[in-house]
């Protein structure tokens, strides 16, 4: 739970448990750059926020598919978790101490868009004036028909987006150079298929839930196909030859429905060694986000729900202008690992903010167990007012009150 550091760097550097790593800044040569025929000079930053974050090669190279994730995923919660969670998946195979991040450079927006399409029938190819080699959509064929609801059940849109991350390592032969050391892809899968009637494209939106087992089955099949396409790209395009021998990890992310206020989660990942066209065994992520308070929390995580409700009640008792307290917990298995709490309140002076923040910080220590991270964000109509961080086994939380 180090995400908060980047947002409050000036204050967070004082925390011993979250001290960044300072190393000598290196200027190195980047080999096998996908968009360049010649080697490029890049810089490895000397600043690493923590051992949970990758250093990014500089100058920052935007992905040729930059911005697509914003349009293709359902909610801002999913967008944030899909990108940050994919880095968490990468750590299973690529050590942040020795690997350096670069936004994906091999899959451009046209490629991703074509892969997100449905597969077309021969008749549809003729109708759209497309060549057979352009029929690369990973989503299933929709052959048409009058029963739109039945078609939605039988052939929903499973795949919503593909996100690529690249990871570089220093060359074993020459440490003044870095080479591509790994590619990580995230496949964002829909948990609900949204559609309109064919004859009323601007009419009401209908929903077709997709069973978890179906999401996983389809996602694994698509992941295997994507791996083979990456290897083929290396054979077809000399500028992408590095894809032939690089280790590849592909992870499946299940989106939440549009109306939810919690993010989706990664459900599994598989990897292929360099040069292999076959993914290995699938590994379950066993992660889940839970809203507090909620029926799910009450049913499955009663002790945590009770602690949260006691905290919520204390906040309501203390402050008459209270609006709401909402929490989002990240579970790995049955264990709560991280709890983020948002408290939006209208204040009428700095003294109120200070007093309320002190009270909340004290209640965190008294009411919640010590084994998980807690982050409390206190906001008003003016923006962020205070941030409270409590890490496992801390006797005192870190508190920052924003100056406005």
State what each model feature region is.
Residues 33-194, 214-222, 258-331:
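N-proximal, solvent-exposed amphipathic alpha-helical segments enriched in charged/polar residues
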């Amino acid at each position: 739970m180090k995400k908060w550091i980047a947002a409050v760097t000036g204050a967070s550097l004082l925390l011993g448990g979250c001290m960044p790593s300072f190393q000598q800044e290196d200027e190195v040569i980047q080999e096998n750059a996908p968009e360049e025929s010649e080697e490029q000079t890049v810089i490895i930053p000397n600043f690493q926020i923590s051992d949970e974050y990758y250093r990014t090669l500089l100058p920052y190279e935007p992905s040729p598919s930059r911005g697509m994730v914003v349009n293709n995923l359902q909610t801002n919660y999913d967008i944030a978790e899909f990108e940050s969670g994919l880095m968490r998946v990468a750590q299973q195979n690529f050590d942040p101490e020795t690997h350096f991040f670069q936004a994906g450079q091999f899959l451009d927006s046209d490629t991703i868009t074509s892969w997100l399409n449905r597969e077309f029938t021969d008749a549809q190819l003729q109708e759209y004036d497309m060549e057979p080699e352009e029929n690369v959509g990973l989503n299933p064929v929709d052959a048409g028909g009058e029963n739109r609801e039945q078609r939605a059940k039988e052939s929903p849109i499973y795949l919503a987006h593909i996100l690529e991350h690249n990871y570089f390592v220093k060359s074993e032969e020459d440490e003044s150079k870095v080479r591509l050391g790994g590619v990580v892809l995230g496949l964002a899968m829909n948990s609900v298929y949204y559609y309109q009637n064919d004859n009323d494209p601007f009419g009401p939106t209908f929903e077709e839930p997709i069973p978890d087992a179906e999401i996983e089955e389809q996602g694994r099949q698509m992941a295997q196909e994507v791996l083979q396409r990456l290897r083929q790209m290396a054979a077809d395009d000399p500028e992408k030859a590095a894809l032939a021998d690089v280790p590849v990890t592909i992870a499946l992310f299940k989106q939440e429905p549009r109306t939810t206020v919690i993010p989706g989660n990664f459900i599994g990942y598989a990897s292929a060694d360099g040069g292999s066209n076959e993914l290995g065994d699938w590994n379950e992520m066993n992660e889940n986000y839970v809203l507090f308070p909620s029926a799910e929390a009450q049913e499955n995580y009663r002790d945590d729900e009770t602690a949260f409700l006691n905290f919520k009640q204390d906040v309501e008792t203390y402050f008459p202008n209270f609006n709401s307290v909402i929490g989002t917990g990240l579970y790995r298995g049955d264990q709560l690992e991280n709890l983020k709490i948002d408290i939006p309140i209208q204040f009428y002076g700095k003294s109120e903010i200070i007093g309320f923040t002190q009270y909340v910080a004290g209640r965190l220590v008294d009411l919640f167990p010590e084994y998980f991270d807690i982050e409390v964000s206190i906001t008003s109509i003016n923006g962020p007012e205070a941030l409270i961080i409590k890490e496992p086994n801390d006797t005192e939380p870190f508190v920052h009150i924003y100056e406005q």
